[in-house]
């Protein structure tokens, strides 16, 4: 089983988008085949906020209870890393690579665990490459 860090935007790609992006679909298939996603502690808040925002803006193409059921079905397979990196590390990554603190947390987790990063975010991909972190394809 291969571990990887899962960016919230990728998971939202298969939870909200109908159909999901090709990349989100490939990542979901890797999970079905046994790859284990790792997420930073704020992932749950980021996903929850995105769902609330999408619902308020009437952007959800599926019912929220169906989306929540899909998330709950995934939760046993997602490992939450509850050891946040220190603030200096996150701020430093953010400054050097033009990342938000949230995106720096995903990047730092991938670096610390020495696992690939699943993201389509251009700034995160650029930061990961400069840090020799592989991008899940």
Please place each PLM-identified region on the residue numbering.
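Active-site neighborhoods of divalent-metal-dependent phosphate/nucleic-acid chemistry enzymes
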Residues: 76-116, 120
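Phosphate- and divalent-cation-binding pockets in alpha/beta enzyme and binding domains
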Residues: 23, 46, 89, 126-127
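Active-site-proximal, substrate-binding regions of enzyme catalytic domains
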Residues: 48-78, 89
């Amino acid at each position: 089983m291969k571990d990887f860090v899962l960016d919230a935007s990728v998971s939202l790609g298969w939870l909200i988008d109908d159909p999901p992006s090709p990349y989100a679909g490939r990542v979901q298939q890797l999970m079905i085949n046994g790859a284990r996603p790792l997420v930073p502690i704020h992932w749950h808040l980021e996903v929850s906020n995105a769902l609330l925002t999408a619902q308020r803006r009437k952007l959800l193409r599926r019912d929220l209870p169906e989306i929540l059921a899909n998330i709950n079905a995934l939760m046993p397979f997602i490992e939450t890393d509850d050891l946040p990196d220190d603030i200096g590390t996150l701020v430093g990554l953010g400054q050097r690579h033009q990342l938000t603190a949230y995106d720096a947390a995903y990047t730092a987790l991938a670096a610390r665990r020495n696992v690939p990063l699943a993201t389509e975010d251009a700034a995160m991909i650029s930061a990961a490459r400069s840090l020799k972190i592989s991008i899940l394809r």
